[in-house]
Amino acid sequence: SGRGVRIKTDSPFVTHCKSKQGELLACELPGREARRTEPRFTNLPTAAEALFKVIAPLLLEDTETPYVLIGHSVGSWLLFELLKLIVSGGVPEPAQLVISSFPAPSLPTSERPWRAQRQLGEAAFKDECRRWDSNELIFQDSLWEHYGPLMRDDFTLFDEYVYEPPQAPFKMPIQAYVAQRDQKVTEKHLRNWAGLTSAHFSLESVPGHHLFFYDYPVRNEWMDNVIAALPENCR
């Protein structure tokens, strides 16, 4: 979760799942791609509840097969909220949580490395988007009419987010990744995820900027790394 990336050729994730007779389930939030006409979420817990309603029956149907949750950018916070619902709902927990390019949700609001979009005029908001390494094409007038409101809503997801800690630290290991040229999120921000689990925490770096998913060689290198770091029962 976190990016609406459409992959037209087999990625390392797809190849790995095929070789293990596993499944790869991608989350596409309302307001994007095939769901672009649906109202967008502006509240992460609400989005997590909607995702939980979809995924919980699948996990309860097969309680023996291990699974991993993977989230990029604000998708990491979406998975944090989803995990709280999984734990409290008695649903089988993931064998591992993989997150990239976003601070731990426990980071105090005053230390978040961005400016709240509601305080920004259009020019300042575009500048903020550029600092997240957004593609310059979206700032063309004909495209900004669509992407401007979409990104305002996306920013609201993390601007207005209020952290509520889980009842206890999670029990699964957390594998984290920081992009080497990310203008916003640093290694220090990622290390704070360690406090959310009682299990092992690992942090590695990947080449590229915040949206390294759009650099296919880097994305595939990252995917290979994720696969190599999977728990034994998921390899």
Which positions does each model-derived feature cover?
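Residue in the alpha/beta-hydrolase core beta-strand immediately N-terminal to the catalytic nucleophile
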Residues: V68, H72, Q96-V98
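Active-site catalytic motif of lipid deacylating hydrolases and related acyltransferases
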Residues: S1-Y67, P103-A124, P207-L211, N233
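A conserved amphipathic alpha-helix that caps or lines the catalytic cleft of carbohydrate-
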Residues: V14, L79, L83-I86
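The conserved beta1-alpha1 loop
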Residues: S1-G2, H72, V178
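Gly/Ala-rich beta-loop-alpha elbow adjacent to hydrolase catalytic centers
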Residues: G71-G75, L79
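Alpha/beta hydrolase fold serine-hydrolase catalytic domain that processes acyl esters and thioesters
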Residues: I7, A56-L60, K84-R235
